[in-house]
Amino acid sequence: MTATPESLFPTGDELDSSQLQMESDEVDTLKEGEDPADRMHPFLAIYELQSLKVHPLVFAPGVPVTAQVVGTERYTSGSKVGTCTLYSVRLTHGDFSWTTKKKYRHFQELHRDLLRHKVLMSLLPLARFAVAYSPARDAGNREMPSLPRAGPEGSTRHAASKQKYLENYLNRLLTMSFYRNYHAMTEFLEVSQLSFIPDLGRKGLEGMIRKRSGGHRVPGLTCCGRDQVCYRWSKRWLVVKDSFLLYMCLETGAISFVQLFDPGFEVQVGKRSTEARHGVRIDTSHRSLILKCSSYRQARWWAQEITELAQGPGRDFLQLHRHDSYAPPRPGTLARWFVNGAGYFAAVADAILRAQEEIFITDWWLSPEVYLKRPAHSDDWRLDIMLKRKAEEGVRVSILLFKEVELALGINSGYSKRALMLLHPNIKVMRHPDQVTLWAHHEKLLVVDQVVAFLGGLDLAYGRWDDLHYRLTDLGDSSESAASQPPTPRPDSPATPDLSHNQFFWLGKDYSNLITKDWVQLDRPFEDFIDRETTPRMPWRDVGVVVHGLPARDLARHFIQRWNFTKTTKAKYKTPTYPYLLPKSTSTANQLPFTLPGGQCTTVQVLRSVDRWSAGTLENSILNAYLHTIRESQHFLYIENQFFISCSDGRTVLNKVGDEIVDRILKAHKQGWCYRVYVLLPLLPGFEGDISTGGGNSIQAILHFTYRTLCRGEYSILHRLKAAMGTAWRDYISICGLRTHGELGGHPVSELIYIHSKVLIADDRTVIIGSANINDRSLLGKRDSELAVLIEDTETEPSLMNGAEYQAGRFALSLRKHCFGVILGANTRPDLDLRDPICDDFFQLWQDMAESNANIYEQIFRCLPSNATRSLRTLREYVAVEPLATVSPPLARSELTQVQGHLVHFPLKFLEDESLLPPLGSKEGMIPLEVWT
């Protein structure tokens, strides 16, 4: 190759533009009436970043960039302009505006770089053609403008003229895409591919920096503890937005780290705090990031700008809020509740179809082949197929799964990850944690485009789908013959059955009874693992919620925090294959591209339980919200939960939910107020075991701590109430479960309805819905990770409370009335008035119905658990007697017509004469007690 003559390359001191003629160039124009925001880069651009040296498309096409030199700063009197003056340049691009400060020499360096770029491009044949014949809307020649010569600072008028010269110089350059998109220009303007994405908020602060390695406040990520002594400096491009900062690799453009602002946020300048000359230190709860600037003045400027940005729309995340939550209450939020999986899954499916950018999912267990709308007649509503279709459309799907201890749990998250990752490159799945731990990621969350979020007790997994019918059988039609079998996979496609004539609601592993048999062989999803001809399924009752707007942003931020935390802490996820995620700005949260029907206007606050092992920070705002809501309730509490392990003794059990309930009832009793507490629990814990022989060690361990909370021992709720008021406790609290019946094999069958809900309703005005059980695992924060929302009504409607007129919240009232209606069988009793939950007549009806139903079920099925079996000996005698359902099915059917709804009393005397703690020699007995509580 012929050497380039050195004379073609300017030294940077020459500012003569005579050899910089341009034939023509495009002129940025917008159509009349066109909004510049419509041309800005889409949010998905964050996943397609390029090297900062390859001239990526930074500016929105057709949207002009304008500059204005708005002032100067002199910081050394008597010096020359080129060394003592900073020019403040105000730039505008559409709705974005920002200020950069430059010395005169920065203009000189830019001028030199653009000259070199012009000369180099003219030497390349194809590039020369592109320069000479670039499209134009005007025929006028354009040339590289000249810089004013540097000289001594003169009068104010002279300084103003220099500002105008620089302003005109820059504006002429910015009309030419040949120079405007060159990396030297974008670096000078402090812009990147992340600058003009509306959902990321305002432009923010950007620039080239040197950052120091380390500083992570995560065990194992620092070389020598917190005060790291072995580190390296790396050159990166820093981007600061209103609630986070990030830095990018210059060579690839990939995001190398994201630091979310939180209550630990602090910015410091100086060698004492940074151990670096011209250093800036940015602290959050997760990391202490140290940057090195070119001068102390630049360090002060950057620190000031970062602090001001953090005080903008993202300032909510710089402090803890009510209940010590990371998120504040968000008024004006559209929220909709779901009872049972049918409605929840269908709404999730509809939201997935509307996704345009991102889908976030985190679950304790996720079954890729679960159907979201049923009965399924094709694969259109199968979760993995839906995610694959959206990924093919360009939507980015990020999934976080709990990585279980395989010897203890059979949810096979490894299979779920492999099955999903093979579908499309846009689907990314991470599992956490790697280390063996006693605790779990128990939260359930799905977020679409960071504007709509689902959460509650429902995993997108087998066994969760149900409706208000709580069917015990699924034989596909009215026939109960053995010939009625669910569809089996086609020979040519072993993973997918033929569904063209399907009438089944639960296919393969979805037909389940978790006490009869736990799930096995999950990699064979369409094969039954229990005999549906002889074994009834166990109905699944659960509650979920969907929220829009700002709370969805808060929930997305939680997911992003966990995702980025996992990526940072696990070596296998540090590759660019797993991208860092970025939270959208709260400033655009109310621009909803879609909403789900049925939402009601409420105030919503996101709550969570997290610890350093799970998310890098500690929070137990769910517990705080439970305690506060119970303490401040005036009329009643309605609690549905999978577990109820509480009443602190300061040693084994630490949460005080049960204690607050006792205190609130005692206060009402002392003051003579009408106050009710309704508690609904599953009649048995959801572990595999033969209850006819006592249920197995796992079932008995949970029963032990449940009864310890409810009625056994000095710390229990009923023991403390009886000590204070005798039998009057029955006027204040009701503890029940749910049961149903059906037909299978020609005779009646019964099964408990497994309550998996995690919901609290107070006074028909306040609701807590989430994934958190009432136990230490879910509530302390240091154990399982959980999510919940506190929903407060802002719209009311007339109702009743203890016979008096009462303004009830629409969200809470509608949810409570729906729950009561299904539980009490209101569909067969149109005269049942559910408005007043605490009057004597209603409370007595509730208690009588629970007692009557329990007696009928015991008489017909001799079902367990039962108050008649207070020891293992009486249990053996009890199950030895043939039930009426087997001896005389016709008589049993006749008696069952008297059952109303599903409500039954919780058997408080079941095995009360036995010690239910696991034997010390058993594997369950060797597990720490904290696992059960």
From Swiss-Prot:
Keywords: Cell membrane, Hydrolase, Lipid degradation, Lipid metabolism, Lipoprotein, Membrane, Phosphoprotein, Repeat. GO terms for cellular component: brush border membrane; cytoplasmic vesicle; endoplasmic reticulum membrane; plasma membrane; presynapse. GO terms for molecular function: phosphatidylinositol binding; phospholipase D activity. Residues 437-464, 751-778 form the PLD phosphodiesterase domain. Stimulated by phosphatidylinositol 4,5-bisphosphate and slightly activated by the ADP-ribosylation factor-1 (ARF-1). Residues 1-34, 477-497 are annotated as: Disordered. Interacts with PIP5K1B. Interacts with EGFR. This is Phospholipase D2. It is found in: Cell membrane. Phosphorylated by FGR. Ubiquitous.
